[in-house]
Amino acid sequence: MARIHTRIAHQRKDFLHKESKKIANSYDIVCIENLNMKEMSQDMHLGKSVHDNSWGMFTDFLTYKMERAGKKLIRIDRWYPSSKTCSCCGKVKEDLQLSDRIYECVCGNRMDRDENAAINICREGIRISGMMLDIEKKIS
């Protein structure tokens, strides 16, 4: 049994190295949420499914690969309401539940919740970095 767990751990580590390398080679700037997975697993009662996802290891790999390549990794504060903010109009939806997988706003925006959050994380990273870009062309 221990041999199986070791093999799985090596496969996971290999996968995380390959994916972080792919991202570091493809982008000059990467924006991620600064998540505390241990706290999330306790607070949200998500248990092992969240705790066992290797997010910390992935971000460590991505951090050193971006640094070695002279590229920038921007961490967005975990309290930034990326999922609750409409990526079209900026309105914050306070009553968004974890079970709501589709984000719907009064402005008419309707999209996958994670896609909406990703757009907001990208915009916040651009704001933090002070870059002046045509955001709509870069995100769309």
Where are these regions (language model features)?
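Positively charged, helix-rich recognition surfaces that bind polyanionic ligands
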Residues: M1-S140
